[in-house]
């Protein structure tokens, strides 16, 4: 079980060579967060990985805040595309 990084990048890139835009970073973090969330359904006591999950959630939150501040339209389309609350 792992994230298909190339597929996530392909689905969210803004240009042909784009791998580091906030949209791509948020999409990759979202995919990893969803994967870890499923992991915790069976491994309830895995607190070490839970800390990593919280770090990813916080990083995604800061990237989303940055994107919202820079370009609100891109922010709105991204959260709608990824199905995030807000």
Curated annotation (Swiss-Prot):
Biased composition (Basic and acidic residues): 7-16
Source organism, top-level taxon: Bacteria
Alphabetical keyword list: Ribonucleoprotein, Ribosomal protein, RNA-binding, rRNA-binding
GO molecular function per UniProt: rRNA binding; structural constituent of ribosome
Keyword Translocase: no
Transmembrane segments: none
Annotated GO biological process: translation
Cellular component annotations (GO), alphabetically ordered: cytosolic small ribosomal subunit
Chain intervals for the UniProt region annotation (Disordered): 1-22
Subunit structure as annotated in this protein's UniProt entry: Part of the 30S ribosomal subunit. Forms a bridge to the 50S subunit in the 70S ribosome, contacting the 23S rRNA.
Role: One of the primary rRNA binding proteins, it binds directly to 16S rRNA where it helps nucleate assembly of the platform of the 30S subunit by binding and bridging several RNA helices of the 16S rRNA.
Matches recorded under NCBIfam families: S15_bact
Stated family: Belongs to the universal ribosomal protein uS15 family.
Entry protein name: Small ribosomal subunit protein uS15
